[in-house]
Amino acid sequence: MAAAGSYQLALQQLTDSALPTGAFAHSLGFETYIERGLVHDEASFGVWLSAFVGQQLSYSDGLAIRFLYEGVSFAELDALLTAQLLPRQLREASTKMGTRLLEIGTEVFPSPELAEYRALVGAGRAAGHQPLAFAVVARSLGVPLTESLAAYLFAAVTSLTQNAVRAIPLGQNAGQRLLRKASDDVAAAVERIGRLAPDDFGAVSPGLEISQMRHERQRARMFMS
C-alpha cells in the first residue's frame, strides 16, 4: 500500500487524457444525438453530459468501482458489467479501453491483484472492463474511494468533452466551460454513488442506451461508439 498522499502524481498519470487507452475514439452515444440534431452546441451537449454522468457513469462504472473497493471480486463485477451493458458498442468500448488499461497498468503500476485480473482476461474468464481495471490500479496505489471515483468520472468527462469539441464542433473555451460546469455533476455523482444499493446497479436511462444502440447503424460516424 502506498504511503498516504504519495499517489497523487500516479493518479494524474492514470487519468491523463494522454494515456493511450483509445478514449478519443468513443462518443458513448452522443454522436447519435448530434446526428438527430439534439446535441448541436455547448448548451445541448452540457445537458447530455450531465445526464450521462448522473445516470450511466453513476449507476454502472461508478458503482462497480465502489463495490470493488468494498471487497466484491472483480470476477463477479466483470460478469455483472458484461450483463448490464446492453448496447454492444458500449460493451466493446468498455472492454477495449479496459484491456488496454490492464496492459499499461501491468507495466507501469504492477500489483498482484492487477496481474490476477489480467490473467483472468487472458484466459477468457473475464472481459476486462475499464472501470474495474482503473479501480484495481487505483486501490493498489492507495487512492481513497472518493478520490478514485472523482478522478475516474472527471477523466471520462474530459475525454467526452474533447471529443465533442471535435465533433459538434465547439470552441476550446467552450470545452473548458463545460468541464468547469461538469465538476459539480461529478461531485454530486460521487456523493450519490456512496448511497446507492446493490439493486441500483445498472439502472441506466433507456434513452441513453437506445442512442448507443442506434449508433451501430448510423450511416456516417466519427466514433466507434
UniProtKB/Swiss-Prot annotation:
Record's subcellular location: Cytoplasm
Any Pfam family: UreF
Chief site of localization: cytoplasm
A GO-annotated cellular component: cytoplasm
Keyword Lipoprotein part of the UniProt annotation: no
Similarity annotation: Belongs to the UreF family.
Role: Required for maturation of urease via the functional incorporation of the urease nickel metallocenter.
Designated name of the protein: Urease accessory protein UreF
Species assigned in the record: Arthrobacter sp. (strain FB24)
Phylogenetic lineage: Bacteria, Bacillati, Actinomycetota, Actinomycetes, Micrococcales
